[in-house]
A protein has these predicted regions:
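Long, positively charged, glycine-interspersed low-complexity recognition regions
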Residues: 292-294
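Conserved H-loop
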Residues: 297
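P-loop NTPase motor domains
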Residues: 3-290, 306, 371-392, 406, ...
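Surface-exposed, flexible loop/turn segments at secondary-structure boundaries
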Residues: 44, 75, 300-301, 329
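P-loop NTPase motor core of the ASCE superfamily
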Residues: 117-123, 280, 303-409, 413-415
Length: 415
C-alpha cells in the first residue's frame, strides 16, 4: 500500500476509526522512521501513543527525532513556537496567507464567501500589520500576540505608522481613502470585522506559547527530525482551532520540499480545523515523501466546513480509503467509488404446465450503500492504492481490522 497517495478514514462516532486505523498509522510511521505531525483533537489521546512508541523505536532513526508538544491548556507542559517567525516569510503574500488562515478559522462561514468585501477587508488589514512587524527592526516583534495588540490600538495611530512604509502604503490604499474621505462608519466596520474575531484569541496561554521559539516547524529536516503533536480542546474549538490552523499552514509549506526526510501528517477530526493548502498538499506531496492521513466522520462535515469545491477535490484525490459505518450520501458516494461487479441472476417461473428457469447478468454495486450503513464496530470497507511494479490485485476490501495488543520486542537487527 502506498501511503504517499494520501489516506482518508471515515466513520460515525464509535465505529472504531481511531482505534483501528489512526492509532496504527502513528505506530507504523514511527516504526518506519517517519517525521511526524499529529493534530490531536482530543489531546492527549494520540500524543501519548506517539510519545510511548517513539521511546520504544527511536533507535530506528538515523538521527533520533525530538518530541515536541503544543498545548494551550497547560503552557507549563507545552513547548513554544512562533508561527509568524520573520525568517519564514519572504514576501507579503506569506503574510496574507497567515492572515487568511487565521480569519477563516475564526469565521468558518467566510469559506463560502471568499472574495466578498467584508471578508477580504479584515484579511488585508491584518496582512499589513503582520508584514509591518516583519520589516520593523528586522522582525524583532513579529509574533502573533504582537500583531493582535497592534491591531487593537487606535486606527489613526496604526494607519499613520503603516503608511510611513512604501511597501504598505499602496496595499492599504482602500483604507486610507476611506479614512481621508471621511467614510468613518465604513472604515470602522472594516476594522471591527478584524478586531472582533481576533479578540477571542487574547489569552495569556496563547500569547505565551505563540511568542517563543523552542523549535522550528520544518519537522522533516534531515538534520533535526521532529515528532510534533498539537493539541486542541473540544470545549475551545473556535479559539484554539484558529491558532493551530496557522501552524498547519506553515508546516504544509515547509515539509512539502525535496531532499527532506519522509514524513507523515495525521489530522484527526479534520472538520474541526480549516487546513489551508490541504488539497494542494495531497496532490503534490507524493514525490516529496509526505504521507497525509485525514480522519473525519462523513463527507457532509467536510462540505460544510471546507466548501463544496475544496471538499470535492480532497475526496477525489485521496488514494486510500478506510470507512467504518457511514450513512446517507456518504455511503452512496463510497459505494459508487468502489464500483460495480457483474453478477448472475437466476429466476424461476412456475405455472400449471411447466417450470422455466432463466439466467441473466446484471451490474450490481460491489459494496452496496445499505451494507456500508450497517457495518458493525471494527468492520471496515475501503480501497487501497498500490505502487508501480508492486500491483495489488485485490484493492477493494470488506473486513474486520484486527488490532494486535501484544508488545513485540524489536528484532536484533533493529537494536
Amino acid at each position: 500500500v502506498n501511503p504517499f497517495r494520501a489516506s482518508m478514514i471515515l466513520g460515525t462516532p464509535g465505529s472504531g476509526k481511531s482505534y483501528a486505523v489512526v492509532n496504527n498509522y502513528i505506530k507504523q510511521a514511527i516504526e518506519k522512521s517517519y517525521a511526524l505531525y499529529i493534530y490531536d483533537f482530543k489531546f492527549d489521546d494520540l500524543s501519548v501513543i506517539a510519545y510511548n512508541h517513539l521511546i520504544k523505536y527511536r533507535h530506528r532513526y538515523k538521527i533520533p527525532p525530538k518530541f515536541y508538544v503544543i498545548n494551550f491548556d497547560n503552557p507549563r507542559k507545552s513547548h513554544r513556537c512562533n508561527p509568524l517567525a520573520p525568517e519564514l516569510m519572504t514576501d507579503i503574500s506569506d503574510a496574507y496567507e497567515s492572515s487568511y488562515t487565521i480569519m477563516l478559522n475564526l469565521n468558518k462561514s467566510w469559506v463560502q464567501k471568499q472574495g466578498d468585501f467584508f471578508v477580504e477587508s479584515p484579511i488585508v488589514l491584518f496582512t499589513a500589520i503582520i508584514w509591518f512587524l516583519k520589516i520593523y527592526e528586522g522582525g524583532k516583534f513579529c509574533t502573533f500576540p504582537h500583531a493582535i495588540e497592534l491591531l487593537n490600538k487606535r486606527y489613526e495611530d496604526v494607519f499613520t505608522i503603516l503608511t510611513s512604509y512604501p511597501d504598505l502604503e499602496n496595499y492599504l490604499s482602500p483604507f486610507i481613502d476611506a479614512w481621508k474621505g471621511g467614510a468613518s462608519e465604513q472604515l470602522q466596520g472594516q476594522i471591527a470585522s478584524a478586531k472582533i474575531p481576533l479578540s477571542r484569541l487574547i489569552s495569556p496561554q496563547l500569547y505565551w506559547v505563540m511568542s517563543g521559539s523552542d523549535f522550528t516547524l520544518d519537522i522533516n529536516n534531515p538534520k533535526e527530525p521532529k515528532v510534533l503533536c498539537v493539541g486542541n480542546n473540544p470545549d475551545r474549538i473556535s479559539i484554539y482551532g484558529a491558532a493551530l490552523g496557522l501552524y498547519n499552514s506553515r508546516i504544509v509549506k515547509l515539509i512539502n520540499k525535496k531532499k527532506q526526510l519522509k514524513s507523515c501528517v495525521i489530522i484527526d477530526e479534520l472538520p474541526t480545523i480549516f487546513f489551508k493548502g490541504l488539497d494542494n498538499l495531497i496532490a503534490t506531496a507524493r514525490s516529496n515523501k509526505v504521507a497525509v492521513v485525514l480522519g473525519f466522520q462523513d463527507f457532509s462535515q467536510l462540505k460544510r466546513d471546507y466548501g463544496d469545491k475544496e471538499a470535492a477535490v480532497i475526496m477525489s484525490t485521496v488514494g486510500n480509503v478506510f470507512s467504518g459505518q457511514v450513512v446517507g450520501e456518504t455511503a452512496k458516494t463510497l459505494s459508487e467509488r468502489f464500483g460495480k461487479i457483474l453478477q448472475k441472476r437466476e429466476s424461476m417461473s412456475i405455472n400449471r404446465n411447466d417450470t422455466s428457469t432463466s439466467i441473466n447478468t446484471q451490474l450490481d454495486s460491489l459494496i452496496p450503500a445499505s451494507k456500508i450503513s450497517t457495518l458493525s464496530q471494527g468492520m471496515f470497507v475501503g480501497a487501497v492504492a498500490d505502487n508501480f511494479g508492486e500491483t495489488i490485485e485485490q484493492k477493494i476490501f470488506h473486513a474486520q481490522i484486527v488490532v494486535c495488543l501484544l508488545y513485540t520486542s524489536p528484532s536484533p537487527r533493529d537494536s
